[in-house]
Amino acid sequence: MNRRFFIQTSAAAATTPLLALNQTHSAELVDVNFATGKWPFRELPKLNSEALKQLGITRAITGSLEALLTRDVAAVNARLVAVCKASGGVMLAAGTLNPRLPAWREDLRRCREEHGMKVIRLHPNYHGYQLDEPLFAEMLDAILEFGMAVQIVAQMEDHRTQHPLVQVAPVDLKPLHDLLQARPKARVMVLNTNATMITTALRGCVSLWIDCAMIEGVGGLENTLKIWPIEKLCLGTHAPFFYPESSLLKLVESDLSKTQMTSMTAVNARAFLGT
């Protein structure tokens, strides 16, 4: 096999599934789990709005990787907004809050009133609080009072790839069941859930949205839909930690109907955003 033939066939293999996806989903393709900014522990692929558009992604709810370890939350959110404004409408900023910091209410006000954000993305494990603490319920209620949606990141990466001095356990999601029962109109999504979380800690959380970024295995989406409503499952890539093509290929390889595909790639995200 010569070099030119190898390159041509490899490129065709990479693009054919994405072309198949373009034929099955609607014109709108929303990624609910995208991030920008520097990650201090290793170099991540540099993905921007142009890279997303080339993959057919029309909108990406975007958080900041800087938010996990930076105390100046206001500056992090301001930089995120600047990046998203330059994306031509592709990237939708999801601000962060840290309830362990005294100015979290002011940070929330800025997110909504100054930046016009619709979503807050939370990292409880990196910011050092549990979902059963009163401060989380207080912050959740404050976010909901502003009419905003909430994303909770269950985990960022496998513990085996974490820096040995920064070992961060996944979020304990069990308290969400009672929290959501008491707040039936809350728009809450958990990102990066895996099969174990879905079948244990999140069982019965019927009003909760999840994404597909860490749903793995043969027939992963189909198996998830046996226990989770299609109306609450969204496309999420977890890029740039994961290559975005990974989640797109899950759709191509699935047996989802066109209606289910449209729900997962666009309709459900719009419902979460309240649009």
Regions found by a protein language model. Name each.
Residues 30-32, 61-64, 94-96, 121, ...:
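Active-site neighborhood of phospho(di)ester-bond hydrolases with catalytic His/Asp-centered motifs
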Residues 43-49, 75-80, 104-107, 174-176, ...:
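Alpha-helical scaffolding within the catalytic cores
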